[in-house]
Amino acid sequence: MVSLNQQWHVIASSEDLPFRHVYQTRLLGQELAVWRDDAGEVNVWENRCPHRGVRLSLGVNVGDQLKCQYHGWKYDSGSGQCSFVPAHPGAKPSTACVRTFQCTEVNGGVFARLEAAGSEHKPNNSAPIDAAVASNLRSHTVPMSATAAAGLLKEAATLFAPVLGSSTDGVQVLATGLIIDLKCAGLLDTLR
């Protein structure tokens, strides 16, 4: 059986990656930096510099490399391999390498998966990613009362009970892009 980490997921629309921009998103709890190099290739990387752990989405897309904002280390498009350390410009670059993820761009959508699967097939989406789907890729804040939030959490726990088993500690509801940490929401006791 293929795990969620091995399946392709839409993480951005092509419009989210304008020239030399770095886009930040999450997939199954993994924070990602998504960017397009000047040759048009999309990169999906763990959103942490291997040097000091700073978010790479705060960095600079310099065309064929992503430059960390903190110490200026540069990582090559595609491989994520460190290619330049400003403190040692004449030395061989560090062996540091950003964790990269498989990605592809299909009909206006950027797809990624966190683990390689046995099959190397790419997502086959013949329909373009429309505005309604693209808008769901973004975060939305919806004000609601504590009573409404408790009701939503009860429904989510019921809906995902077959997947989650009997434990609801730290549940993340990711199916619609809505992430709820039940412990932080302070409503865990309400669900029991």
Question: Where do the model's predicted regions map?
Answer:
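Rieske [2Fe-2S] iron-sulfur-binding subdomain
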Residues: 1-41, 76-192
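A residue-level detector for conformationally permissive "hinge/kink" positions
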Residues: 21, 64, 71-72
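Short Cys/His-rich metal-coordination motifs, predominantly Zn2+-binding knuckles/fingers
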Residues: 28, 52, 71
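Immediate flanking context of iron-sulfur cluster ligation sites
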Residues: 36-44, 55-64
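Short cysteine-rich clusters marking metal-coordination/redox-active sites
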Residues: 49, 68
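Short functional micro-motifs and their immediate structural scaffolds
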Residues: 54-57, 74-76
